[in-house]
Amino acid sequence: MAALKDQLIVNLLKEEQVPQNKITVVGVGAVGMACAISILMKDLADELALVDVIEDKLKGEMMDLQHGSLFLKTPKIVSSKDYSVTANSKLVIITAGARQQEGESRLNLVQRNVNIFKFIIPNVVKYSPQCKLLIVSNPVDILTYVAWKISGFPKNRVIGSGCNLDSARFRYLMGERLGVHPLSCHGWVLGEHGDSSVPVWSGVNVAGVSLKSLNPQLGTDADKEQWKDVHKQVVDSAYEVIKLKGYTSWAIGLSVADLAESIMKNLRRVHPISTMIKGLYGIKEDVFLSVPCILGQNGISDVVKVTLTPDEEARLKKSADTLWGIQKELQF
């Protein structure tokens, strides 16, 4: 008696199952899973692989997503602590690492996470030598540098999520003040993801109308409306969310899926993301900071040259010096 499947279905060809648009997420904590669900909801991959060291949690997260397959259009969701499961990925997103504690600066995390990266990155490279690496773990700018050094990849293929979220927070808060959707509020936060990020007030606009042309004091202490508080809120917001719920996840997950979309669909959108900035703004060291980058299928193909005020440029340089001070002490 033939099996039910054979009675029902006539096979016409033996297919080789090589994924065309595979994405891997390393780390299935709150951030990794927020990235995973956001990517699944945007239909960006034909295969999603999850990797972590905690096997029970990993299998549970995979099964939970698989059980939603009817409502998704990603036909294959897999997981393992063995990196062979990640083979042939177009994009590998690293969210693994020690979690930021309440009140802990992102920079304080660094050596703990370098040691984790020394294991992860060579394994990723072994199975997907042509992938783009998207680093999300904090401190993201330093760890993007670490991933670049360990991987041996060209700099266009090693991307830090950087200030994509900082800029999104900035545009949300700006929109709240003005009663306008964040998509129509334009403004860029550049530099270090975190405490020393730089808001570029000269470029802040709605419908091409520069806010600085209406309020020349914008972003300064002399501003009666204290718009610089908007940037202060951006810097403080992660700490506040961590204090309230213990971690951040949803916004960073959505932000990462936004970057993944630009890469997987070769959109060539401009994002404030972390890239090797040596040679720009008088920076002479191998540091990664966020500047507006054109993002597509090859990763970061171009950088947009932003005109900064002398003060903004000085702040960017100071960030670079701070990061280099830490990077040159790293053991790897």
Swiss-Prot record:
Annotated substrate binding sites: R106, N138, R169, T248
UniProt-listed InterPro entries: L-lactate/malate_DH, L-lactate_DH, L-lactate_DH_AS, Lactate/malate_DH_C, Lactate/malate_DH_N, Lactate_DH/Glyco_Ohase_4_C, NAD(P)-bd_dom_sf
Positions annotated to bind NAD(+): 29-57, 99, 138
Enzyme active site: H193
GO cellular component, one term: oxidoreductase complex
Modified residues (N6-acetyllysine): K5, K14, K57, K81, K118, K126, K224, K232, K243, K318
Pfam families registered for this protein in UniProt: Ldh_1_C, Ldh_1_N
Sites of Phosphothreonine modification: T309, T322
Pathway(s) annotated for this protein in UniProt: Fermentation; pyruvate fermentation to lactate; (S)-lactate from pyruvate: step 1/1
Enzyme class of the recorded protein, top EC level: oxidoreductase
Gene3D superfamilies, per database record: Lactate dehydrogenase/glycoside hydrolase, family 4, C-terminal, NAD(P)-binding Rossmann-like Domain
N-acetylalanine: residues carrying this PTM: A2
GO biological process, one term: pyruvate metabolic process
Modifications the protein undergoes after translation, according to the UniProt entry: ISGylated.
Sorted UniProt keywords: Acetylation, Cytoplasm, Isopeptide bond, NAD, Oxidoreductase, Phosphoprotein, Ubl conjugation
Record carries keyword Cell division: no
Top-level taxon: Eukaryota
Covalent cross-link (Glycyl lysine isopeptide (Lys-Gly) (interchain with G-Cter in SUMO2)), residues: K57
Main location: cytoplasm
Compartment annotation: Cytoplasm
Subunit structure, as described in the record: Homotetramer. Interacts with PTEN upstream reading frame protein MP31.
Homology family: Belongs to the LDH/MDH superfamily. LDH family.
Name of the protein described by the UniProt record: L-lactate dehydrogenase A chain
Organism: Rattus norvegicus (Rat)
